[in-house]
Each structure stands twice: as structure tokens, then as C-alpha cells.
């Protein structure tokens, strides 16, 4: 597939952009090249694609649900109970919708943390964009939960580390109020050992 965008604004200059096989081949004024598809970019600007640095993509499924309430009431009374009924297939379709919306708005990479992360990873693979997907790590300050969560994250890393070149596995400790200090240190060390990204919720709202 090759594409030629004509007369587009790039770095405050009007130019053409030629792309082929998923890569930019040349940028310049009045390019004399042929392409399978040509677009007129007059009045438009060419920008690098955007990065969504933190998302729960499958929560597109809950858009409009339980709006305008305090964070912890929203989490404990509304979101966590409904999330308990989610399946991997539901997460896949919610994430697919999010991927389509991101593509439409110019985002080609997302950093995601959510339940049933296998579904999100499949959605990324099928959508064509890139991303890091983290399994949610919550131990609620309980030692037995912590042991279970560590084992689950280790297993997910081993299972998904070679899933797809565009999709990488990351670590997602939920927050300092749902993950013990000991588990946070374990996440830090595990991520450093395997060169993984970490995302966490900080300074969200007053309790």
C-alpha cells in the first residue's frame, strides 16, 4: 500500500508526504512520485501520531454509567461490582471500540491497565496500533492476595512477553491505597529485572 498526501502543512511549510509499506519514504514540495492512493491535504496539518499514556480501554463499555459521583463511591459501589461480571470477550470488544476511536483521533499507541488483559492485547493486535498492556495488581494489603497476585503477574509475563511485536506486557499496581508497600517494591524489582513499564494511579482525589 502506498499513499501520497499533497499540499499538507508540515513544520509550517506546505509539502507532500509519500508513504509506502507502512513507512514514510519522502517529504518535500511537489514530490514527483506515484502512489496507489492520493489525498489532498490542503488546509490540513500533518502531525506525529499521539500516545495515550494511561487508559482502561475496555471501559468504553461503561460510558455514561454512574456519572458525577465521588471517586470512591464510583469505584466501590458502581464500577468494581459491574467489573466483576466482565469476561475476556467483553473486554476485547470494549478495547476494539477504544482502538477505533484512538485511530480516528490520531493516537497509535496506548498504555493500558485493565482486567482480562488478554482481551485487550488481542484487540491491539487486531486493530493495528501499538500498546503496552498491564494486568491489574491489587492485594488490598493482604499477604495471601499479594502472593496470588505476584504469581499471576509472573505467569502473565511469561505467557504474553512474545505475544506480538506491537504489543508489550507491563506492570499495573492499581494504587497506593489498594497495593501494599511490599508488593509495590516487588513490582518495582520485577519490572526492573525484565525491563517492563509500570503505571499506577496517584493523587486521584481526596478520600
Where are these predicted regions, by residue range?
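Divalent metal-coordination and catalytic microenvironments
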Residues: 8, 22, 43, 54, ...
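Short catalytic-loop micro-motif centered on adjacent basic/acidic residues
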Residues: 108-112, 170-173
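Short, acidic/polar
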Residues: 89-99, 114-119, 148-154
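Active-site gating loops and adjacent loop-to-helix segments of metal-dependent hydrolytic enzymes
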Residues: 61-93, 100, 127-142, 147, ...
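Histidine-centered catalytic micro-motifs
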Residues: 49-60, 197-206
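Metal-coordinating catalytic core of metallo-dependent amide/deamination hydrolases
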Residues: 120-207
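Histidine-rich, glycine-flanked metal-binding segment
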Residues: 2-4, 9-47
Amino acid at each position: 500500500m502506498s499513499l501520497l498526501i499533497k499540499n499538507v502543512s508540515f513544520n509550517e511549510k506546505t509539502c507532500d508526504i509519500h508513504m509506502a509499506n507502512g513507512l514514510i519514504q519522502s517529504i518535500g514540495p511537489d514530490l514527483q512520485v506515484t502512489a496507489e492512493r492520493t489525498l489532498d491535504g490542503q488546509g490540513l496539518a500533518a502531525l506525529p501520531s499521539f500516545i495515550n499514556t494511561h487508559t482502561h480501554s475496555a471501559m468504553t463499555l461503561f460510558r455514561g454509567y454512574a456519572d458525577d459521583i465521588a471517586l470512591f463511591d464510583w469505584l466501590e459501589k458502581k464500577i468494581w461490582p459491574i467489573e466483576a461480571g466482565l469476561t475476556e470477550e467483553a473486554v476485547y470488544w470494549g478495547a476494539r471500540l477504544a482502538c477505533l476511536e484512538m485511530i480516528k483521533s490520531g493516537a497509535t499507541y496506548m498504555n493500558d491497565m485493565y482486567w482480562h488483559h488478554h482481551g485487550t492485547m488481542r484487540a491491539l493486535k487486531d486493530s493495528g496500533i501499538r500498546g503496552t498492556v498491564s494486568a491489574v495488581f491489587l492485594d488490598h494489603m493482604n499477604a495471601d492476595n499479594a502472593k496470588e497476585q505476584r504469581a499471576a503477574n509472573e505467569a502473565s509475563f511469561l505467557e504474553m512477553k512474545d505475544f506480538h511485536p506491537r504489543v508489550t506486557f507491563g506492570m499495573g499496581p492499581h494504587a497506593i491505597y489498594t497495593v501494599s508497600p511490599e508488593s509495590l517494591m516487588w513490582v518495582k524489582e520485577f519490572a526492573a529485572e525484565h525491563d517492563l513499564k509500570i503505571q499506577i494511579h496517584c493523587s486521584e482525589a481526596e478520600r
